[in-house]
Amino acid sequence: MSTRRLAALAVAAALLAAAQAQANEVVHVPSRDGTVLNAVLIRPEGAGPHPAVILLHGCGGRDARSGALDPRHADWAERLAGAGFVVLLPESFASRGQGPQCTVRDRRILPWRERRADALGARDWLAAQPFVRAEAIALMGWSHGGSTVLAAADAPGFAAFVAFYPGCSRALRAAAFAPAAPLLLLIGEADDWTGPEPCRALAERAGLAVTYVGYPGAYHGFDAPGSQVRLRTGLAFTVRGDGTAHVGTDPAARADALARVPSWLAERVRR
């Protein structure tokens, strides 16, 4: 390859890196409990105003060990921004000096307490931005973040809710569960970490307010990009109570979710 060609490729790579750096902006978002949250903001093309979606990480936190967004979060954020959504990813654990919580039984950061406050604070912050349609903000989360979606589902000001494989038992035990906006629940029918049964029962009780999608044979984390199914150990809470659960990609379930969720959200935030 010629020197000129190599130089051109180097310039192109530098421009791409600069564009990506501009696309992923670090912002500071006040939680309703007063905590200042580190958050990543990704804006679609155009001045807007655009619909927006808040993405809530699971018990492992928002970022990979490298410091970049976890591959699942990065994948979804890129796809949703490409579909015209402003995307905000607050980090609930590191912002409070805490690490991953998957193996922690005595958790200091809970879906119905700190993380609900974070979700509402993120909504407040987005609603104040001139490039966001304040009436078109959705909330979406995975596992611990999905449980947070359920905990915040009674709050006004959201256009839609999406929860991937949440823990549904607490919501099911509540005297009433009435989402303030449509809720989409997606879970693997073989999930042995949070378990599908409470979520299925919750959806049946809630009626038309909740859409339940169960994927036969899929485990926890089925929508992750290229994650081989494996058995995790040492987890704090699992279906069997022995600290073990399977996680990993299910290609068919992932493909369905990647097509279903953006379309479903677009329908709920349409003008």
Predicted regions and their residues:
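N-terminal cap/lid segment of alpha/beta-hydrolase-fold proteins
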Residues: 22-48
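Short alpha-helix in the alpha/beta-hydrolase fold that links the catalytic acid
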Residues: 194-204
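Short beta-strand/loop motif that positions the catalytic acidic residue
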Residues: 179, 185-187
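Short substrate-entry loop that stabilizes the transition state in hydrolases
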Residues: 48-50, 58-98, 170-171, 192-195
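Alpha/beta-hydrolase active-site loop
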Residues: 108-129
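Acidic catalytic loop of the alpha/beta-hydrolase fold
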Residues: 190-194, 220-221
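Alpha/beta-hydrolase fold nucleophile elbow
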Residues: 131-141
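Cap/lid segment of the alpha/beta-hydrolase catalytic domain
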Residues: 61-72, 89-114, 229-243
